[in-house]
Amino acid sequence: MSERLLVLVRHGQSEWNLKNLFTGWKDPDLTELGAAEAKDAGRKLKAQGFVFDIAFTSTLIRAQHTLDLVLKELDQTGIPVRKDQALNERDYGDLSGLNKDEARKKWGDEQVLVWRRSYDVPPPGGESLKDTLARTLPYFVQEILPCVLRGECTLVAAHGNSLRALVMVLEKLSPEQILARELATGAPVIYRLNADATVASKLDLAA
């Protein structure tokens, strides 16, 4: 039986990350730094000897561009790639496109902090982290995890909050624990899974 390998990569810095804007389902591309982060992720995975069988990403360009750059560094651009909005970033609703300082002026520091850091309180017209997990987890269980358990080396390039959903189920974290977990941009996290989908080992390639 092949190893059951799953690699998660958060997209590199986007143009709106740089401008300190709430992004969500808006679709800015990577900055030069973000592209460099993605290429570096590919080099790190190449140094580890990874050969991927399949990749998953969101419908947003910053994640797709990250995946493309990673696969180019690996010389593995021909593998199947599945794109689905289930892996999209949390939808920030009325906050999307706003500078975070502007949002604090409009709604107040405390309210914006609640929207950003609570588990189940959504911003107006948007999703809470709980809502994001409810969208992402079924896709992971039904589409991604079966590939891993079949022994297919699987790469997922997505977003901070959608990847939190995967980390939450893989590491069996509580809502409080997942809220505290930050995923670095462009830093691969490698999971080796047991046959029952529990984590046998984890390696974080951040910096």
Curated annotation (Swiss-Prot):
Query: Which Gene Ontology BP terms does the record give?
Result: gluconeogenesis; glycolytic process
SUPFAM superfamilies registered for this protein in UniProt: Phosphoglycerate mutase-like (SSF53254)
Q: What CDD domains is this protein classified in? A: HP_PGM_like (cd07067)
Which Pfam families has this protein been placed in?
His_Phos_1
- Indicate the enzyme's highest-level EC class: isomerase
The record's GO molecular-function terms, alphabetically, read: phosphoglycerate mutase activity
Pathway noted in the entry: Carbohydrate degradation; glycolysis; pyruvate from D-glyceraldehyde 3-phosphate: step 3/5
Q: Which reaction does it catalyse?
A: (2R)-2-phosphoglycerate = (2R)-3-phosphoglycerate
Q: Which residues does the annotation list for site: Transition state stabilizer? A: 159
Family under the similarity heading: Belongs to the phosphoglycerate mutase family. BPG-dependent PGAM subfamily.
Q: How does it assemble?
A: Homodimer.
Protein name in the entry: 2,3-bisphosphoglycerate-dependent phosphoglycerate mutase
- Organism this protein belongs to: Nitrobacter winogradskyi (strain ATCC 25391 / DSM 10237 / CIP 104748 / NCIMB 11846 / Nb-255)
